[in-house]
């Protein structure tokens, strides 16, 4: 996805996208660890900066690490932020970041919005989640938002048709899940437990897009 027009495209594809960044930041800001003044927070897969803009607005005291493997996305995020906030920019993956000196156990919270769904379940999802857990202080939380497989197979056809209809009504030729790798709640629970988190607590859902709070175990 090109950075130009990325936010508009996401709002056409994802129900409730306009509220995702605001809700994600508000949830993390209400957590015990990240509520502390000057907390260090990781935005893993920051894209064009939606969560960064919300974080600098809601919590200007936070020290943010904006992480994305795409130089183009980071450049667009930097343009949108325009020098706001206390930010460190990193063109990298979370798996590489956590191995750098001083990164393990550094962060009081993390955000990962619409990232895990792009990783295949061939060890890549587990590696990503494990690296996030290692980046966090014990007891710190991760807000994870992702496209999920439905837990109600009898409604799968209706939900998919509704998603296609939502996109058409938003002025977009309906897209498919090609290139995405959604998993179900049972598989997500297994992966996050193996990575070092407790069970996921669902806090948001719009059709197949679901948001969870995950707490790093001590």
Identify what each model region corresponds to.
Residues 1-35:
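Conserved class I S-adenosyl-L-methionine
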Residues 40-44, 48-97:
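Class I SAM-dependent methyltransferase SAM/SAH-binding core
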Residues 96-104:
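Short conserved loop adjoining the S-adenosyl-L-methionine
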Residues 111:
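A conserved beta-strand element that flanks and buttresses the S-adenosyl-L-methionine
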Residues 114-118:
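Short catalytic micro-motifs in class I SAM-dependent methyltransferases
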Residues 126-138:
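A short glycine-rich, Lys/Arg-flanked "PGG" loop and its adjoining helix->strand segment in the class I
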Residues 145-195, 201:
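C-terminal alpha-helical "lid/dimerization" subdomain adjacent to the S-adenosyl-L-methionine
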Residues 195-218:
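Core SAM-dependent methyltransferase catalytic element
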């Amino acid at each position: 996805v090109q950075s130009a027009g990325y936010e508009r495209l996401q709002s056409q594809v994802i129900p409730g996208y306009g509220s995702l960044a605001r809700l994600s930041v508000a949830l993390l800001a209400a957590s015990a660890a990240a509520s502390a003044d000057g907390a260090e927070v990781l935005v893993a897969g920051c894209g064009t900066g939606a969560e960064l803009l919300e974080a600098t607005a809601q919590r200007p005291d936070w020290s943010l690490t904006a992480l994305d493997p795409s130089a183009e996305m980071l450049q667009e995020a930097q343009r949108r932020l325009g020098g706001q906030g206390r930010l460190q920019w990193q063109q990298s993956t979370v798996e590489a970041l956590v191995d750098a000196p001083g990164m393990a156990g550094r962060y009081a919270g993390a955000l990962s919005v619409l990232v895990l769904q792009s990783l295949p379940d061939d060890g890549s999802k587990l590696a990503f989640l494990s690296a996030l857990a290692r980046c966090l202080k014990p007891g710190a939380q991760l807000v994870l938002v992702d496209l999920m497989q439905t837990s109600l197979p009898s409604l799968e056809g209706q939900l998919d048709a509704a998603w296609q209809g939502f996109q058409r009504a938003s002025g977009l030729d309906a897209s498919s899940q090609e290139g995405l790798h959604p998993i179900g709640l049972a598989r997500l629970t297994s992966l996050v437990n193996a990575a070092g988190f407790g069970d996921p607590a669902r806090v948001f859902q719009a059709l197949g897009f679901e948001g969870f709070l995950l707490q790093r175990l001590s």
